[in-house]
Amino acid sequence: MASQALAQTADMSGASRQSASPATTRQTLPTISVHDRRQDPNGLLRMDTANSTGSRLGLTERETPASVTVIDRETIEARGARSTHDVLNELPGVHTSATHGDVKVTQRGFRGASINQVYNGINLQYSIATQPVDAWIYERVEDIGGPSSFLYGAGGVGATINYITKTAQRHDISEVQLGAGTRRYRQAAFGLNRRIAGDGSGQNDHYVRIDTNHERGGQWADDNRGHSSQIVTSLLSDLGGGFTHTLAYEYQHERDYRPYWGTPVTQPAEGRQSVMERLRHKNYNSADGLYMQRVQWLRSMADWKLSDALSVKNTFYGYDAVRDYRNVEEYALDSTNTQVNRTSALLQRHDHRVFGDRIDATLHSTIAGHRSDWSFGVDVSFNRQTTYPTYASDDWESAVDPDHFITEYFYDLPGMVSTYVPKNRHRVNNLAFYLENRTDLTPTLKLLTGLRHERIKLHFSSLDPEEEVKRDGRRSYHPTTGRIGLAWDISPQAMVYAQYATAADPAAGNLASTYYSQILANDRLTTGRMLELGTKLSFWGNRGSATLSVYDISRRNIATNDPRDRRVTYLIGRQDARGVEAKLGLQLTPAWSMQANVGYVDAEYKQFYRRGESLAGKTPSNVPRTVTNLWTSYALTPELKLQAGARHVTRLYGNENDTIWWPSYTVADVGFEYRFSPTVTLSGFVNNVADRLYATESQPDMVVLGDPRTAWLTVKVAF
């Protein structure tokens, strides 16, 4: 359009020179409007941007023989994702449920510790460390479906999700965002990136970035209130000679008063579950219930480009977190639905530290005239966690009226003390070696292979002063996992691929928090393997793009917790999952775009006995068969864009024998974006427009409800 405007200007200028005297006539040219034609985040799939999660070789999604999805910064903002929990629900086939006790992510038929959640590629081996935080501090979220232990270590048979934090860039950034919404939600966020030294030549140039965010309010359960803050800052230094260094620090703080843990279901709790509408917002936690977390990250990243063919990167990292809990966490209605029985009063502290160093290299070479790229490295980490659990008396139970009640102060509970007493300590030391290669067998046929070997040492020790015989358990694990994938570019617009990958998972969940009994019962990690076939293509004159994959995953020797008592463990011999994932992006017209994804999985136990009963053929609890997402945007004018989205989740089983379930649900969202200028944008969103009552997690006697109708506005100013 700009070239057309210049041509039109030239033609009209020539005409004016021919028809008028230069000394006496001046002609005013018509105004030419130039509109921003950036790709809409809800349109075509962005498959040609390099990612760091599907491979360490810097491949794009289109080049990777695996299912890879990237939710970038622009997409996060366009869809109004306020937290990392919101972002996860945009990934294909992903279902999440988040309370402060645990963040349960389900993908490809597996959940919990079978889904690796890593931060800038760093695996903390602890799912509670993945509490949802505001999305402002993240540049993007990347996901690879299926086994990925060969990239990020033990875990990840179902998927790996990688949160990439904002860091300093080589260009100026100045932005402020203010938000307000229902239930007194408030947000204030700020971002700044500047060169503070040097002339931009790459010799002794230094860039600093700081991003801050503060949120308050927005909670929907009665008497639940809280606030959170995040600060991310980094210094990027170009020191010359191909050497750069980035020093990054991150701080997170959150306090949630009287947090919500769930809602009791109507009794009898058999078959289809339901919740009485009048109990939707009830909060049965203690009057002074609390969740608090303080998290700090420090990373030192040195990159050295030795030549066009060889580069080396070293990352030193430190993580320190403290999480405090004082809550009554479980509730059940009695058989007449006239009182709520409250149990599981827990005072807890998690003191978690991780330190490590990772050095890896990338080499571009040839083998017999064929391009061959290599990535190889060493990762060493030291993971320490001390827990401070104190329970109320074993027989403690409180009964209250479902509608009119006053709950106690937590420290008034029988047997409860007001100090944190260390009870358990976990130490996990890990030394890993990894290697990855991509070789061009022909100009259109590429072979991708990967291998990782780990030397893991786990040490559990009891610190409980009341124990007469101290518990002490040690295990060593030496898993080797890998991937082999083949990608065939059948045309410039389409490719097909096949891959086989393996994984090694902790049998009973997270290595940094597993119970002593589980350590004794499991002398090896569980094994998993996957076969996947897929295709990625552009079509319709590059106005459409799509991906499709089918997979078969099998995992052996699993330990799972009893849904009625998390301290009771059952052993599962084998669990399988077969499924299909698809993504579609369309630019229907210059103003109208659409994007959708769907995940279907048939997950079932193959070998599982509980109390002498075979549960073979049953679906694991809280694993939906189908998850579908849809977004569409329409630009009414260059300044105003409307959008809508919908999410459908099929039934969630609440126990292992599939006798209770929460039914399928669909929620719809709407929003708009208005650009007052290229630097000022007003956005508005309404989630769950119909105010649908739905659950994101099902348990035998209670469910975790999803958010009711929620609306908010944000103003973002760039300067």
Go through each PLM region and give its residues.
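Acidic, small-polar-rich N-terminal luminal/periplasmic segments of exported/outer-membrane proteins
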Residues: 29-172, 533, 700
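Transmembrane beta-barrel wall of Gram-negative outer-membrane proteins
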Residues: 173-175, 180-260, 290-306, 452
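Repeated loop/turn-to-beta-strand initiation elements of outer-membrane beta-barrel proteins
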Residues: 200-201, 205-208, 242-245, 309-312, ...
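Structural signature of Gram-negative outer-membrane beta-barrels, strongest in the C-terminal barrel
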Residues: 238, 352, 371-373, 379-383, ...
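Face-selective signature of the C-terminal outer-membrane beta-barrel domain
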Residues: 296-320, 343-463
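Membrane-embedded beta-barrel scaffold of Gram-negative outer-membrane proteins
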Residues: 301-317, 321-329, 489, 495-497, ...
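Gram-negative outer-membrane beta-barrel transporters
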Residues: 444, 552-554, 571-656, 690-693, ...
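C-terminal beta-signal and adjacent terminal beta-strands/loops
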Residues: 648-655, 673-719
